[in-house]
């Protein structure tokens, strides 16, 4: 990036680091007998050209083509980013099959498994605090802060693995009866927190 400044200023402004991808999906050409009923752009070439354009304009998206030339692995920063891309493509007339999302893991210098961790900020009515804390604990979330923000209002801050948050927004809205507000940002990669309880309901991103 370029820094525009006074001639006497010689130190450039450092670029803001880009968060790494934390989740991936695989999209494939729809080969079912019903192909073409919901869209007109069906071929792997059309899908690839669209993904190339997306990767050029969206620094948060990367993709690779599988050995099976009819499928592509798309990586992005969370389920919302991937959901937006899929929605845009379908509105543009693309038809494809989509795999369930997968979390992207890393390893540290000692070979230990690391997973993406998010910071979650929740604003809600006090009466729902215990339900949200319990639901986050089930997802390996750790409560960092709890404070009053007004009459009968609370703000909770958690760190939780990305894999535990897939599909959580709808669950959160149910638990808070639609009154809570949840914000998520990437925090970093941390120690793998172990297996979680089985999911009661499935999670779809598109």
Feature annotation, model-predicted:
Residues 1-206:
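Accessory interaction regions appended to the cores of large information-processing enzymes
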């Amino acid at each position: 990036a370029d820094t525009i400044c006074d001639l006497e200023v010689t130190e450039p402004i450092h670029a803001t680091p880009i968060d790494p991808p934390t989740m991936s999906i695989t999209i494939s050409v729809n080969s079912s007998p019903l192909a073409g009923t919901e869209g007109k752009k069906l071929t792997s070439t059309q899908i690839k050209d669209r993904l190339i354009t997306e990767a050029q304009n969206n620094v948060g998206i990367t993709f690779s083509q599988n050995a099976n030339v009819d499928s592509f692995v798309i990586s992005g920063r969370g389920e919302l980013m991937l959901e937006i891309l899929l929605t845009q493509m379908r509105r543009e007339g693309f038809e494809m099959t989509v795999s369930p999302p997968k979390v992207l893991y890393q390893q540290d210098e000692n070979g230990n498994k690391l997973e993406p961790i998010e910071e979650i900020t929740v604003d809600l009515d006090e009466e729902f605090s215990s339900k949200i804390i319990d639901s986050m604990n089930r997802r390996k979330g750790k409560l960092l802060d709890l404070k009053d923000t007004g009459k009968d209002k609370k703000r909770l801050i958690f760190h939780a693995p990305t894999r535990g948050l897939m599909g959580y927004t709808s669950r959160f809205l149910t638990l808070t009866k639609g009154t809570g507000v949840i914000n998520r940002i990437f925090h970093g990669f941390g120690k793998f927190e172990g297996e979680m309880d089985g999911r009661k309901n499935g999670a779809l991103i598109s």
